[in-house]
Amino acid sequence: MYYNEDDRYAKHKNLKRFLVLLVLGFIFYAGFQLFKGWPKPQLELSLKDQQIPGSFNISWPTDIRYGVIGTLQSGIISKTPNQGQWPLASVAKIMTAYIILKDHPLSIGQDGPTLTVTQKEVNEYEAFKKDGQSVVKVALGEKLTERQLLEGLMIPSANNFAYILARWDAGSVKAFVDKMNKTAQSLGLKDTRYEDPSGASAGTVSTPPDQFKLTQLAMQIPTFRHIVAMPQVNLPIAGIQYNVNYDLGKDNIVGVKTGSSLPAGANFVFDSKQGNIDILGVIFGASGKSPLITALKDAITLVDMTKTQLSTKKLISKNQQIGFIKVPWMKKEIPILASQDFSTVVYPGMKITYSLYPVKDIKFPIKPNEVIGTLVINYGDSTYSMPIIASQEIEAPSFLDRLRRVF
């Protein structure tokens, strides 16, 4: 076949263009591969979910309306078959004290600010007393510290002290009740509604699970825990006032609050300190000839049934390998470690599950002990999170690593 010079030149030119484009394409591809981001490192969990052998057994008393039992450390273990809203009566004062101590913290031994009793508060005392409410005597001009007001609120259960504290904290009782409801909402107490700071209103209602959760938080405040464990208090005008919680000291009960009214019957939130375990329970609507005595006796029964089934177990040890990290440019898997110990109260049948989440943006190089993720432990009714750390240095990809990626 005959080709003229123009044909040969055109073919040579086209080949040259093709080769140039091929080289440019390769350079572009290589550059892209060298500098594009790497796939995200993968964290993998090696911990296995577990369940404590056996089953938790409890017989709920038949003379209460609603109840829950559990521990301060690991949450609710058992509930009565039915649950619902119920008038709180003086159990409402747990929230009142909780808010006061959050807004005006007191260390154990501190008295806090001093308040002066007004004529309005004397009149309020007289009106509440006439109405048959639980009150503590006050006098015009009497000086009461924040601590004394909290002691009068939680020990002899003074409704009038709840109103004094409410006005001091929020400016008015209405504003304080609004704060109670907002606090309940922020804590996830979905079935709780407050109409007053003392619980005298039948419209102040909650459920045992909600009050269990609130008391878990309140009992972590040292001053709250100290006050509810006191058998009596000596106040300036009223003198010695005794705790309405007659279970104090029995079966190591260290608090927390009783509540009685015609609509409520008797309610009792209690904490029994068994070694390093706090058994926490809530009883609503105890009945019988003496409902409060029923509630107090049932609490002891529940503690006795519960305490033999509890133990403390270490679930995680500091520096324990809980999984590994896979890095695309490294062939080996790098162990990842727990940053702390974690122990909790366990019971028969308790389920324990683990989940692992990486930090949002892992940046290299990673130093030894650098936080690269979060381990979430779900145990019974509770959740705990801890940082997860790298066991060794993990270098950023080198130029050679990137170059290998091209080929």
Protein language model features and the residues they cover:
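Active-site-adjacent loops and short helices of periplasmic peptidoglycan-processing enzymes
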Residues: 2, 6-12, 36-209, 216-222
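Domain-terminus/edge residues, biased toward the C-terminal soluble/receptor-binding domains
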Residues: 189, 202-204, 210, 215-407
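Intrinsically disordered, low-complexity regions
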Residues: 31, 49, 61, 186, ...
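Short acidic/polar alpha-helix capping motifs at helix-coil junctions
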Residues: 17, 126-129, 146, 232, ...
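Hydrophobic membrane-insertion alpha-helices, especially the h-region
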Residues: 16-33
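Low-complexity, intrinsically disordered regions enriched in charged/polar residues
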Residues: 9, 25-28, 46, 316-319, ...
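Functionally constrained cores in energy, signaling, and assembly domains
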Residues: 16-17, 61, 70, 86, ...
